[in-house]
């Protein structure tokens, strides 16, 4: 067997495999014998069709099948011998039988060979979110909202109130349009953007007052649409007093006192924003390394990530995009993001390779134990068993490798912490 490898680009190669009749003959004869047994030709008994006629009728199909099997057989061996890292399946580009030789040309994508730029002098800032008593109270108030009640107030509407009013659409002369009235429309101001014209006009309004609202359009050529709202009622959410009994109800007996519940809310906030801080740091790290290492990305790898992003977007719409949604245009728009994902995969694999990162059975066990600690005693044994099962091993191993890679990077760069207030919750 002869082999000729040609570099097409940083991520593409062609491989020519040349086999002698002795090397592919056994497979060819097996295919020919199978054709003799199965092909029926009028005038000949089954299995007794002359070889020459069989070759004439089924020759091209036999040759194609033999070439495919030979390519599959030898490609893996050559990949191992030449230490090739394929990024896609090999495709047969051409097949030729010349004399006693079979020539097969394959094309495929590979992981690019590149040197990783030194990142030891990089500096990153990590947010250290500070949880205050006010943050804890705000979170508790959000929980209590589900147990509150709306009460009518004879006051100017606040940005958190609900305004009920009759809405009339106005014509160009400022008069109500026929059929353009909606009665008892509820405006929940808290859930309207701060720059929403309805929120701006209704904040501060009281029952019995009338306000005018002019909505601007994105298209400057589209005329302004005006409305008149007669405020009939302002409702304000009244939160219940947090008592031990309410705590028991809210938490289904998990906590019995306000103090214990409040302490848990703080712990949950600290854990949440601790994870948020880690995620933001890792995003900064990956973005910097991607920027500093413009590695060529195999098209198949980019396509795989693009497909993943499309499927993730579909799930947000309940499994499929709404009618009229241009999926092809959306897919095209996320290609740059898919390229970043592919580039980061290549960079992280390079870091793992340079640092001999591997996952041991002990790593799997430790990870499973850590996850099991988050569950109830009854679930721990099941979680330990599941996480160490063959079905979950690849997934867990991938997670552990990612964590190890980030730990390696963090140990080699400079990270400074910066006290950061908790972001304002936007409803």
From Swiss-Prot:
Similarity section: Belongs to the FKBP-type PPIase family. Tig subfamily.
Keywords for this protein: Cell cycle, Cell division, Chaperone, Cytoplasm, Isomerase, Rotamase
GO-annotated biological processes: cell division; protein folding; protein transport
GO molecular function, one term: peptidyl-prolyl cis-trans isomerase activity
Reported function: Involved in protein export. Acts as a chaperone by maintaining the newly synthesized protein in an open conformation. Functions as a peptidyl-prolyl cis-trans isomerase.
HAMAP family associated with the record: Trigger_factor_Tig
Species assigned in the record: Chlorobium phaeobacteroides (strain DSM 266 / SMG 266 / 2430)
Listed EC numbers: 5.2.1.8
Principal location: cytoplasm
Catalytic activity: [protein]-peptidylproline (omega=180) = [protein]-peptidylproline (omega=0)
Gene name linked to the record: tig
Name of the protein described by the UniProt record: Trigger factor
Range of residues in the leader sequence: none
Cellular component, GO annotation: cytoplasm
Domain notes: Consists of 3 domains; the N-terminus binds the ribosome, the middle domain has PPIase activity, while the C-terminus has intrinsic chaperone activity on its own.
InterPro entries: PPIase_dom_sf, Trig_fac, Trigger_fac_C, Trigger_fac_C_sf, Trigger_fac_ribosome-bd_bac, Trigger_fac_ribosome-bd_sf, Trigger_fact/SurA_dom_sf
Coiled-coil residue windows: none
PPIase FKBP-type domain residues: 160-240
Spans through the membrane: none
Keyword Isomerase: yes
Compartments, as annotated in UniProt: Cytoplasm
Enzyme class: isomerase
């Amino acid at each position: 067997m002869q082999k000729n490898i040609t570099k097409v680009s940083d991520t593409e190669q062609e491989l020519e495999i040349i086999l002698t009749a002795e090397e592919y003959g056994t497979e060819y004869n097996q295919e020919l014998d199978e054709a003799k047994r199965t092909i029926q030709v009028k005038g000949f008994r089954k299995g007794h069709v002359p070889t020459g006629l069989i070759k004439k009728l089924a020759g091209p199909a036999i040759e194609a099948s033999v070439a495919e099997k030979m390519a599959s057989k030898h490609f893996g061996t050559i990949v191992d011998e030449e230490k090739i890292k394929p990024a896609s399946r090999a495709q047969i580009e051409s097949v030729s039988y010349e004399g006693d030789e079979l020539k097969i040309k394959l094309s495929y994508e590979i992981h690019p060979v590149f040197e990783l730029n030194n990142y030891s002098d990089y500096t990153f800032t990590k947010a250290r979110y500070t949880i205050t008593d006010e943050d804890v109270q705000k979170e508790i108030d959000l929980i209590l909202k589900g147990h509150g009640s709306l009460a009518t107030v004879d006051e100017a509407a606040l940005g958190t109130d609900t305004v009920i009013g009759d809405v009339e659409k106005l014509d160009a002369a400022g008069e109500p349009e026929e059929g353009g009235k909606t009665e008892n429309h509820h405006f929940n101001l808290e859930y309207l953007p701060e720059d929403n014209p309805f929120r701006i006009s209704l904040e501060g309004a009281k029952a019995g007052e009338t306000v005018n609202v002019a909505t601007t359009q994105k298209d400057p050529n589209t005329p302004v649409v005006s409305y008149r709202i007669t405020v009939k009622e302002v409702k304000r959410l009244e939160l219940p007093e947090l008592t031990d009994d309410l705590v028991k109800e809210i938490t289904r007996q998990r906590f019995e006192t306000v103090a214990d519940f409040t302490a848990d809310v703080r712990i949950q906030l600290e854990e949440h924003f601790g994870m948020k801080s880690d995620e933001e740091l890792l995003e900064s790290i990956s973005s910097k390394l991607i920027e500093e290492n413009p590695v060529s990305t195999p098209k198949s790898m980019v396509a795989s990530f693009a497909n993943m992003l499309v499927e993730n977007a579909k799930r947000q719409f309940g499994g499929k995009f709404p009618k009229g949604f241009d999926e092809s245009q959306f897919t095209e728009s996320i290609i740059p993001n898919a390229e970043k994902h592919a580039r980061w995969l290549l960079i992280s694999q390079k870091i793992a390779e340079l640092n001999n990162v591997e996952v041991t059975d002990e790593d799997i066990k430790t990870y499973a134990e850590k996850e099991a600690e988050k569950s109830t005693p009854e679930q721990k044994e099941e979680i330990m068993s599941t996480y160490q099962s063959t079905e979950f091993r690849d997934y867990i191993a991938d997670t552990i490798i990612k964590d190890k890679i980030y730990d390696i990077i963090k140990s080699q760069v400079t990270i400074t912490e910066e006290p950061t207030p908790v972001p304002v919750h936007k409803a």
